[in-house]
Amino acid sequence: MSMHYEDYMRQVVEPMRRELTERGFKELLTPEEVEQYMESAEGTTLVVINSVCGCAAGLARPAAVTSLAHDKHPDHLVTVFAGQEKEATAKMREYLAPNPPSSPSMALFKGKELVHFIPREEIEGAEPEALIRRLAMAYNEHCE
């Protein structure tokens, strides 16, 4: 790929990154960062597989952020960006097995155990409030 294209894509996705990072999500940019985080994870973690698609912009990111206002919420927030940090995303997807690759998607972990997963096909066409409720129910069940 040309350097011009890569620079352009970095500029395009920056606001999409900030939508999560400015609200407390830590970006995991390399496979090593993903592995280091996941292998030492304690408590609960919400993972957002970010994406440039419309359902990420209109549904997944806003639902993830809004869900954090719930009384119970995850201890930690992390994100990887599909299509941007491909190796980091591939590494995170290993922890999401047996679920097939899906972006955007949201996952709740308790320690290293995947306890709740929302794939793209359940995000597309959903009402934002329904996604927020679904996350809140998972938080009620798994978060302190």
From Swiss-Prot:
Q: Where is the signal peptide?
A: none
Record's Pfam families?
A: Disulph_isomer (PF06491)
Q: Identify the InterPro entries for this entry.
A: BrxB/BrxA (IPR009474)
Look up the record and give one Gene Ontology term from the biological process aspect: cell redox homeostasis
Which Gene3D superfamilies does this chain map to?
6.10.250.2150, Glutaredoxin (3.40.30.10)
Entry similarity comment? Belongs to the bacilliredoxin family.
PANTHER family, alphabetized:
BACILLIREDOXIN BRXA (PTHR40052:SF2), UPF0403 PROTEIN YQIW-RELATED (PTHR40052)
Kindly provide the name given to this protein in its UniProt entry: Bacilliredoxin BH1716
- What species is given as this protein's source? Halalkalibacterium halodurans (strain ATCC BAA-125 / DSM 18197 / FERM 7344 / JCM 9153 / C-125) (Bacillus halodurans)
